[in-house]
Amino acid sequence: QWPFQQWAPCTGHWDCPGDRCCFAGYCLETTPSCD
């Protein structure tokens, strides 16, 4: 089960706080960064 930030839909990691990974349209909570 992936820890999604359900309130933060994204199209890429640039949409996520702290440059976190974007997976399946949602930001991952427990990812330090995503290149």
Curated annotation (Swiss-Prot):
The cellular location(s) given in this protein's UniProt record come to: Secreted
**Written domain comment of the UniProt record:** The presence of a 'disulfide through disulfide knot' structurally defines this protein as a knottin. The cysteine framework is VI/VII (C-C-CC-C-C).
Report disulfide bridges, numbered on this chain: C10-C22, C16-C27, C21-C34
User: What's in the keyword line of the UniProt record?
Assistant: Disulfide bond, Knottin, Neurotoxin, Secreted, Toxin
Mind telling me which GO cellular component terms the entry cites? extracellular region
Q: Which tissues does the record link to its expression?
A: Expressed by the venom duct.
Gene Ontology MF terms:
toxin activity
From what superkingdom does this record's organism come?
Answer: Eukaryota
Does the UniProt entry include the keyword Transmembrane helix? Answer: no
Supply the name of the protein. Answer: Conotoxin Cl6.16
